[in-house]
C-alpha cells in the first residue's frame, strides 16, 4: 500500500535531519500524526518561527534574532580573544563549560572536499574583518579533531599567523573523570603528548 502524498512529504522532510533514515522518519511521522498532534503543531510553529525570525549575528555569524547576538553585545567579554568554531552548537558547548570569556566566530562548517565545502564557503572575508579589527590579539581555534577539522585548523592558523596574530589551538586529551582503561588509544596518546607541568 502506498502512503498518501502528504504523509510521504512529511517522511521525506524528516529524513533531512542528521541520523534519520527512512524507517526512523516514518516512525516519527506516525508518532506525530497518531499520538502527538499537539506536539506536531508545536514543532511546526517553532520551526516556522525559527525560519522567519533567526538570522546571523553581524559579527560572529551565529544564529541571532537581533543584529548582534547576546555574546557580541556583551561589553564585559574580552575583546582581545577570538575563538573560531565550526557550528553554533560548538559555541554553545564552550559557553556551557564556562571556560572562555572572549568572543567567537562561527564558520558554519569546515573544509570538506567530499562535501564540496572549501574555504570560500566558510565566511572567511567576514572572519578576517572581525579578526583584524585592531582589538583581537589571539585567535583560539576550536575546530573538531576530525580530518576535516584539522585541515580547517591548519588553513586558519596559516591565514592568521601570516597576519601577525597569535594563534592557539584547543588541546586534546583525557576527558574529566575518564579512566585510562576506557579511553581510546588516540586520545590517550594525545593526552601524553600535550602534557603540561604541574
Swiss-Prot record:
The keyword Zinc-finger applies. A zinc finger (C4-type) spans 57-72. CDD domains: TOPRIM_recR (cd01025). The keyword Zinc-finger applies. GO terms for molecular function: DNA binding; zinc ion binding. PROSITE patterns: TOPRIM (PS50880). GO terms for biological process: DNA recombination; DNA repair. Residues 80-175 form the Toprim domain. Keywords: DNA damage, DNA recombination, DNA repair, Metal-binding, Zinc, Zinc-finger. Belongs to the RecR family. May play a role in DNA repair. It seems to be involved in an RecBC-independent recombinational process of DNA repair. It may act with RecF and RecO. PANTHER family: RECOMBINATION PROTEIN RECR. This is Recombination protein RecR.
Amino acid at each position: 500500500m502506498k502512503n498518501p502524498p502528504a504523509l510521504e512529504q512529511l517522511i521525506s522532510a524528516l529524513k533531512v535531519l542528521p541520523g534519520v533514515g527512512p524507517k526512523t522518519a516514518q516512525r516519527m511521522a506516525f508518532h506525530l500524526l497518531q499520538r502527538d498532534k499537539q506536539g506536531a503543531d508545536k514543532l511546526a510553529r517553532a520551526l516556522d518561527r525559527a525560519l522567519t525570525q533567526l538570522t546571523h549575528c553581524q559579527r560572529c555569524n551565529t544564529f541571532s534574532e537581533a543584529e548582534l547576538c547576546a555574546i557580541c553585545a556583551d561589553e564585559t567579554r574580552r575583546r582581545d580573544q577570538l575563538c573560531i568554531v565550526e557550528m553554533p552548537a560548538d559555541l554553545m558547548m564552550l559557553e556551557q563549560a564556562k571556560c572562555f570569556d572572549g568572543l567567537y566566530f562561527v564558520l558554519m562548517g569546515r573544509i570538506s572536499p567530499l562535501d564540496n565545502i572549501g574555504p570560500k564557503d566558510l565566511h572567511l572575508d567576514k572572519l578576517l574583518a572581525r579578526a583584524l579589527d585592531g582589538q583581537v590579539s589571539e585567535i583560539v581555534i576550536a575546530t573538531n579533531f576530525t580530518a576535516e577539522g584539522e585541515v580547517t585548523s591548519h588553513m586558519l592558523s596559516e591565514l592568521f599567523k601570516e597576519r601577525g596574530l597569535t594563534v592557539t589551538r584547543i588541546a586534546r586529551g583525557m576527558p574529566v573523570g575518564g579512566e585510562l582503561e576506557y579511553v581510546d588509544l588516540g586520545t590517550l596518546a594525545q593526552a601524553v603528548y600535550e602534557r603540561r607541568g604541574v
